[in-house]
Amino acid sequence: MKKFNRQEIEKKVNDVLVDKLGIGYSDVKPDAQLEQDLGADSLDAVDILMELEKEFYITIQDDDIYSMTSCKVSDVYDLVERLQK
C-alpha cells in the first residue's frame, strides 16, 4: 500500500473538499474551519471522511468523525498523515 507524502495528502484532501462541498480551490486554506468557513455540516463530514478512507486506504474512528466539522483543514491533513502510519 502506498504511503502518501504531505504534499500528496494536501492535494488529495483539497480535491475531496472541493468536490464534496462544491467550493473553489481558493476557499481551501489550511486554517479554514470546515463548518464555519467552508459550510460543511455533519453529513458533509461523514461523506468527506468516507471518501478520505477510500483515497488513502485508512480507517477513521468515530471520535475523529464527531470533531470533524469544528476542525481546520490542516487538522484533516494531520489526521490522514497520522492514520496512514
Regions found by a protein language model. Give the residues of each.
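Phosphopantetheine-dependent thiolation modules in NRPS/PKS and related acyl-activating systems
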Residues: K2-A40, L49-M50, K54-K85
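Two-component histidine kinase catalytic core, primarily the HATPase_c
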Residues: D44
